């Protein structure tokens, strides 16, 4: 596990710890080692964990003695949900997922569904900030992004990486839909919004907007990382 990267804003209690972990996922029948970004958002008392893909122990080490209020999965692929129950059970926290990703979720957890069905416009509160759910389908039907206006960030899952929309495998890819989600729902956020993706480095909305036309032209061959 890499050391967590911490982000915050002056005058606010809420901060973001980014935990990079790695694990094996299977893409089209082939096993790959993949790094994922898990985010811990909160203050000294309470947190929300976003995209618990690998290594629950590493994430809980960063959480420490703070209460986990919720575990939010931006979509149902295994590298974004695999550690959800191991993290949630410590504080009996609910797990949240968009219902359109239940079929994908059940490939990893066939017998246990999430507790909360997210919907576009839904809100989660933690510390002195809120997360707004933005339904951003394409990578999967139930992909969501989470906008925190107070901190000026959006957790984009695999809807948008610094290198472009994440390439996808599995049963439900919709690249035109993914581009539509990026253009209509993410690139319309304030230009200085920091995009915190499920893999790799961050990017600003303004920087992503400059690359958008090239992603449209490239189509499914746009350079986003291959992801499960």
Please place each PLM-identified region on the residue numbering:
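Conserved S/T- and glycine-rich ATP-binding loop of Class I adenylate-forming
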Residues: 41, 74, 136
């Amino acid at each position: 596990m890499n050391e967590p990267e911490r982000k915050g804003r002056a005058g606010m209690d809420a901060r973001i710890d980014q935990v990079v972990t790695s694990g094996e996922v299977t893409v089209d029948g082939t096993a790959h080692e993949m790094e994922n970004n898990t985010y811990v958002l909160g203050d000294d008392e309470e947190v929300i964990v976003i995209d618990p893909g690998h290594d629950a122990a590493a994430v809980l080490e960063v959480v420490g003695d703070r209460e986990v209020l919720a575990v939010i999965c931006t979509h149902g692929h295994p590298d974004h949900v695999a550690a959800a129950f191991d993290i949630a059970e410590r504080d009996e926290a609910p797990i949240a997922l968009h219902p359109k990703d239940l079929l994908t979720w059940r490939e990893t957890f066939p017998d246990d569904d999430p507790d909360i069905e997210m919907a576009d416009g839904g809100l989660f509160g933690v510390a002195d900030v809120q997360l707004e759910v933005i339904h951003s389908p394409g990578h999967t039907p139930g992909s969501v992004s989470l906008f925190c206006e107070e901190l000026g960030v959006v957790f984009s899952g695999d809807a948008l990486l610094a290198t472009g929309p994440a390439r996808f495998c599995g049963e439900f890819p919709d690249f035109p839909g993914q581009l539509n989600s990026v253009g209509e729902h993410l690139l319309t956020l304030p230009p200085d919004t920091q995009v915190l993706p499920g893999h790799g480095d961050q990017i600003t909305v303004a920087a992503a907007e400059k690359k958008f036309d090239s992603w449209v032209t490239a189509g499914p061959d746009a350079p986003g990382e291959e992801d499960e």
